[in-house]
């Protein structure tokens, strides 16, 4: 008998129906002659909080963590199922955090039979049967679980010790998570740069008008106005100079399908939904089989889904199918079927937001064309760039061409004051996520999207709810309480330390080190962090 474990009741029912397990043996357990599908909620096994183990000790860096079962009746129902199983399959759309929960379940029930994984990216009958047929097994799943276990251990170590540190130095407990600390540090740095920004231009550029009014900007910037004026005096006003016209074509700036991050950003900007609300609504739509899994950072679709997309949009000129980082198990968020029943209004709004993004992607121009005219006078280079649209897009070929421009006039201007970084909520959400993911992307750790360590939108949302960050319209700032916390972090590179150790945990997936070495290294770094904030720690 094959035992399949799911983590929510709607997914359990859908998987059971898809695989013919039509007999309900107990609440949340469905069987057939060959397959049993059981719902085991994430809260089934509880990690014992360190505050219950520390007995007041601070700092507290235990070698081992404890866990306990919270649902005894379900445990009694599951024991005979695990004993009878010839294979245990985990069916989920989650990443390392979900795989770690499955690992703990198997350890609790002392599973000795083979284990495998179904990736439930889409809760449709065909997709579920395909995932079951092509279920994965192998050492990489154990390594994925180790990444999740180590990440959870670091969460617990950080949460307990940073709370105790704050209490020891006279601040309240904020139940700060690692992700919230990283986000708070980013907002604090950003707020500091805004406070120090004086808007004074720090150089001069030359602007040239040619051929009836088009403006060209010098590529170089001169610190002294006299130097810029000397260059401007050499510009032959009224004469024609040779120039190069370059037309480039790129799809780099095209609209992409939604990821969880862009969906949270889009929903905030267009619907006013906070990130946690967007995630909850998207999870509900996924559970109902209306959209694919929202737990993704991939903005592309695999070739295998071309047929599905073309049942909705027969022509897809705006999307270039082909090689990308999407697979049938990990891809962008898309709608799977039409709404066939009454939905809560906010779920309906989010569904149509996803659908309209899909429509925009497939109906856009397949690429964008940009024209750049560049000419040189002495050592000074002047350029102008614009996007080609409409008929110009259709008739203009790519390449480089020689042309000429007649200079009408030239003048020296103070440089525009440098544009400060944006503190718009969605821009901050995007920036802190990009910062957190940068090393993993560069080093290709390839860890599937993991909600507990990757959702910085929800971390910022939590900071707002805790009163550490203020949301003023669409902009975010540190609150006075947040400033007190940030003052303990400022200039000490704590966020970089936390991100470094998360990368080390993610690197476990590649099998390059052990979980114990990562936890020990993180504990040492965390102890240094605690002692930096509170020199009296441990006394």
Segments from the language model and where they lie:
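Intrinsically disordered, low-complexity regulatory segments
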Residues: 1-162, 185-188, 402, 410-421
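Active-site-adjacent bridging/hinge elements
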Residues: 77, 158, 163, 236-241, ...
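Short glycine-centered, acidic/aromatic-flanked micro-motifs in structured strand/loop junctions
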Residues: 92-93, 265-267, 295
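Catalytic phosphate-handling regions of large nucleic-acid enzymes and associated NTPases
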Residues: 194-201, 286-309, 324-337, 365, ...
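Accessory beta->alpha helical hairpin/"wing" motif in late/C-terminal subdomains of nucleic-acid enzymes
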Residues: 292-315, 455-496
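Leucine-rich, amphipathic alpha-helical/linker segments
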Residues: 318-332, 336, 494-538
